[in-house]
């Protein structure tokens, strides 16, 4: 409860201090994938840019969901507290005409890769090259600090015997004031 109060207070003070732009600096990341969906999935972070390489041996059907969990460290990376988490229907995000934070991130990634804009996704080699999260895409309520973003991609219902995990990514980053 105390950590929730601390996070809420810090977010309030950050908001009260204005909406100055922030820089999102990729530090490191790792991933694990299900060979049922990927022959290969590689994540590399070099010089604050992210590269992804993935090979899908078969069509990835509709129904792929992603849990995006954004966490902040209040003790320099020793432990993390959840700021927010959303479960997204990936097909809805990629094909939506509505703008959202997640849609904006995806559009930015499309500028640096060859991701599909429709579902289902056919077998193939997909990539992302030299991608940065531009300052205008960093939510203004994220205060400076150490962050962990967990991306959990799955089919079925999460945390049940019907869950079929496709991919997990952990990305560590810093948020700095520009």
Regions found by a protein language model. Name each.
Residues 2-115, 121-125, 137-178:
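N-terminal onset of structured domains
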Residues 128-136:
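Short edge beta-strand/strand-turn motifs with a hydrophobic/aromatic core
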């Amino acid at each position: 409860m105390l950590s929730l109060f601390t996070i809420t207070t810090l977010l309030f003070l950050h908001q009260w201090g204005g909406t100055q732009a922030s820089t999102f600096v990729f530090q490191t990341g790792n991933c694990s994938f299900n060979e049922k969906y990927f022959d290969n999935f590689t994540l590399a972070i070099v010089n604050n840019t992210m590269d992804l390489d993935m090979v899908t041996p078969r069509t990835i059907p509709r129904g792929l969901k992603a849990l995006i969990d954004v966490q902040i460290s209040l003790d320099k990376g020793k432990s993390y507290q959840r700021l927010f988490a959303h479960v997204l229907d990936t097909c809805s995000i990629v094909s939506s005409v509505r703008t959202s934070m997640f849609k904006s991130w995806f559009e930015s990634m499309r500028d640096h890769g060859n991701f599909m804009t429709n579902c289902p996704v056919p077998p193939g080699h997909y990539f992302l090259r030299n991608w940065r999260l531009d300052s205008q895409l960093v939510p203004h309520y994220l205060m400076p600090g150490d962050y962990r973003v967990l991306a959990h991609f799955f089919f079925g219902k999460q945390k049940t015997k019907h869950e079929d995990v496709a991919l997990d990514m952990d990305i560590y980053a810093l948020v700095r004031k520009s």
